[in-house]
Amino acid sequence: MSRKSRAKPYSPFRYFNSPPEVIREVVMLYVRFPLSLRNVEDILLQRGFDFCHETVRLWWNRFGPMFASEIRRKRVSPMRNFSRWRWHLDEMYVKINGEMRYLWRAVDHEGEILESYVTKKRDKKAALAFMKKARKRHGPADAIITDGLRSYPAAMRDLGNIDRREMGRWLNNRAENSHLPFRRRERAMIRFRRMKTLQKFASVHANVSNHFNHERHLVDRQTFKERRSAALAEWQSLAC
């Protein structure tokens, strides 16, 4: 038998003493819920695991983007086949060291967070970069709903899809409401200190939120429980 055939398959957990299922649960708790690093540390202690809060920080930084990338890869392809795909675009301000920065988000008609993008300004250049990134990953949308920010039509003219723009009162509530879970999470983290950290966490948070979005308000209790169990089982199989 050759040395190559005897080699063990690569595991991202190989240099960690803790079980992979514990690491996955720690990342899920910290990213999904509005908990601080020390909150997660206390929850784990009640379950019999004595970890420092800095271990929680290390694990989410190391494995959060990896898990998010795998989730996104599984979800992007089916979404490209949607008929009458509608995007809702909106931007929210985030303070970093006292300076205003902007987090752009694209949400589809079913509440899926498609893209998160951080910029220093919200001008045409920023809007164009954001929309190009979203279109490159997800393909074109049949309709794009925005607010009255003039950067959107300016960027859409360059992209040649200004005819697909829709704007009106209450039309963009889906995008605006999608900011609320992130705002709660932001307060628990006591703000961000760097744009790079904000971009990283916003991307990971969006994909984890998508994975555990069971549309609870649209289905009965039994269907919700089945979807929740399936999502948890799939989460525990990430990076295997």
Sequence positions of predicted segments:
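Residue-level recognition of single "structural anchor" positions
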Residues: 1-240
